[in-house]
């Protein structure tokens, strides 16, 4: 069954010129890019995207980071796309939890600056795709 997931290449990934490497890894995994856009993130979009973290101590710095520079937003499709991309991304903490061979394990240094976001469930993917690609 084909799934769709939202993938974000965060400001650190864009600024470090890792977009091509990350997209290549997604495609080599057998996933397809259905939509792709480089965009600036408004505080409103960031707040909606990260609504589950509102009230947590890191919420303000998370919004500041994601709105600090452009991100690449993509709809990625394929069999088990959600789990496949999350495996490809690696653990949230790039140093302690992400294994070598994953995007975060190979390129990440800090939890907040962990290069990519991928939806964590079918429900999240549907909500996030609607936020980032309203006409999709």
Swiss-Prot record:
Major role in the synthesis of nucleoside triphosphates other than ATP. The ATP gamma phosphate is transferred to the NDP beta phosphate via a ping-pong mechanism, using a phosphorylated active-site intermediate. Gene3D superfamilies: Nucleoside diphosphate kinase-like domain. Keywords: ATP-binding, Cytoplasm, Kinase, Magnesium, Metal-binding, Nucleotide metabolism, Nucleotide-binding, Phosphoprotein, Transferase. GO terms for molecular function: ATP binding; metal ion binding; nucleoside diphosphate kinase activity. GO terms for cellular component: cytoplasm. Homotetramer. It comes from Mycobacterium ulcerans (strain Agy99). Belongs to the NDK family. It holds the Pfam family NDK. The keyword Transmembrane does not apply. NCBIfam families: PRK00668.1 (NF001908). InterPro entries: NDK-like_dom, NDK-like_dom_sf, Nucleoside_diP_kinase. The active site is at 117 (pros-phosphohistidine intermediate). Its EC number is 2.7.4.6. GO terms for biological process: CTP biosynthetic process; GTP biosynthetic process; UTP biosynthetic process. It is found in: Cytoplasm. The keyword Cytoplasm applies. It catalyses: a 2'-deoxyribonucleoside 5'-diphosphate + ATP = a 2'-deoxyribonucleoside 5'-triphosphate + ADP; a ribonucleoside 5'-diphosphate + ATP = a ribonucleoside 5'-triphosphate + ADP. Its cofactor is Mg(2+). ATP binds at residues 10, 58, 86, 92, 104, 114. This is Nucleoside diphosphate kinase.
